[in-house]
């Protein structure tokens, strides 16, 4: 008989082991057996909670997306002002939060993006993530720019955030979050200056 309350603990343990496995050996070599060994559980436990490796990857991505949403939300709730610039900066900062730029998170995001081109469930998650960023950016730009300019600025900033993140992930060095923020802030200010 399973212990009451173990499911959330076990799921978190397996997601953490997945992040560690992808960091150590990459997604292709992060087998169910390897992940189970890192988590200190049997292979059957993964099948019980996630059905298969794809289910575990999907749960891991949901975990990273929730961490991203929490990082952005925390920064936005802490704002002293309600200006579009302040909200947009908080979104930039949240996307470069430690939870998103650690080695395990970055490698897992990269594996997720590659897998999302072939797996419908992951493709849906990617579309949700992309739309959420674009929609939130566009909503703030729309407060000060005409609709077409707001959409253009939001698409540009979303692309810049993703591009800076991707370059940082592939650099092989520690992610320079301060430099990434400065570049994104510069683009943000260029777009907001169009409102004058």
UniProtKB/Swiss-Prot annotation:
DNA-binding region location: 31-50
GO molecular function terms attached to this record: DNA-binding transcription factor activity; transcription cis-regulatory region binding
GO biological process, one term: negative regulation of DNA-templated transcription
Pfam families linked to this entry: TetR_C_6, TetR_N
InterPro entries named in the record: BetI_C (IPR039538), DNA-bd_HTH_TetR-type_CS (IPR023772), Homeodomain-like_sf (IPR009057), HTH-type_TetR-like_transc_reg (IPR050109), HTH_TetR (IPR001647), Tet_transcr_reg_TetR-rel_C_sf (IPR036271), Tscrpt_rep_BetI (IPR017757)
Residue ranges constituting the HTH tetR-type domain according to the UniProt record: 8-68
Pathway: Amine and polyamine biosynthesis; betaine biosynthesis via choline pathway [regulation]
Disulfide-linked positions: none
Entry keywords, A to Z: DNA-binding, Repressor, Transcription, Transcription regulation
NCBIfam families from the UniProt entry: betaine_BetI (TIGR03384), PRK00767.1 (NF001978)
Function: Repressor involved in the biosynthesis of the osmoprotectant glycine betaine. It represses transcription of the choline transporter BetT and the genes of BetAB involved in the synthesis of glycine betaine.
Protein name: HTH-type transcriptional regulator BetI
Organism: Ectopseudomonas mendocina (strain ymp)
Gene: betI
């Amino acid at each position: 008989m399973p212990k009451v309350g173990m499911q959330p603990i076990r799921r978190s343990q397996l997601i953490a082991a997945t992040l560690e496995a992808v960091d150590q050996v990459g997604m292709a070599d992060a087998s169910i057996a390897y992940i189970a060994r890192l988590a200190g559980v049997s292979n059957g436990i993964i099948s019980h909670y996630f059905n298969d490796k794809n289910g575990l990857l999907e749960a891991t991505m949901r975990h990273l997306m929730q961490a991203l949403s929490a990082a952005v939300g925390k920064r936005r709730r802490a704002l002293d002002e309600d200006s579009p610039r302040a909200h947009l900066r908080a979104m930039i900062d949240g996307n470069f939060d430690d939870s998103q730029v650690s080695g395990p998170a970055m490698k897992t995001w990269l594996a997720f993006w590659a897998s999302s081109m072939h797996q419908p469930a992951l493709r849906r998650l990617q579309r949700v993530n992309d739309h959420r960023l674009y929609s939130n950016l566009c909503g703030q730009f729309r407060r000060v720019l005409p609709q077409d300019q707001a959409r253009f600025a939001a698409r540009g900033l979303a692309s810049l955030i993703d591009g800076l993140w991707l370059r940082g992930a592939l650099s092989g060095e520690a992610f320079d979050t301060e430099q990434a923020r400065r570049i994104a802030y510069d683009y943000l200010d260029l777009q907001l200056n169009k409102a004058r």
